[in-house]
Amino acid sequence: MYMAMLVALTLAFPSCNVEMELGNNTLEYRERTAYLCSYDWQDDWYDDYGLHHFQVLRFYTNGTGEDFIRIQDARGRWEEYTYTFTWDWYDAFYTSIRLNYGGGDYSYMDNIRLGEGRMECLLDGAAVCFCSY
């Protein structure tokens, strides 16, 4: 009798399967990657020397990206730099990204919060807020 009841309960509730999905094929991975790659992310700030920095990050779904930086002094002189990188989600919760610029040069974006056209994170330990455009 006990065995029959156990079999009946097992067959009656097949949809109660509890799973934990991690990796590149999960819905959360696809949603967060799609959101990240749907925008150019920009930030600007002044450093301790009065130089104005403007940065744009572009992420592509194939794991590549571009980092555009423009630095301008008080007299209006400026320099521009464009770097390419490969990127990947660096944790199973999709809150950290590793940027590989090549030659052993890495940057890390941690504690990422995405939403409402903003990406807030710690970029190499410094709190930053990128806005989408």
Predicted regions and their residues:
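Lipid interaction determinants
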Residues: 17-84, 91-133
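Sec-dependent signal peptide recognition
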Residues: 1-6
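C-terminal motif of bacterial Sec signal peptides marking the signal peptidase cleavage site
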Residues: 12-15
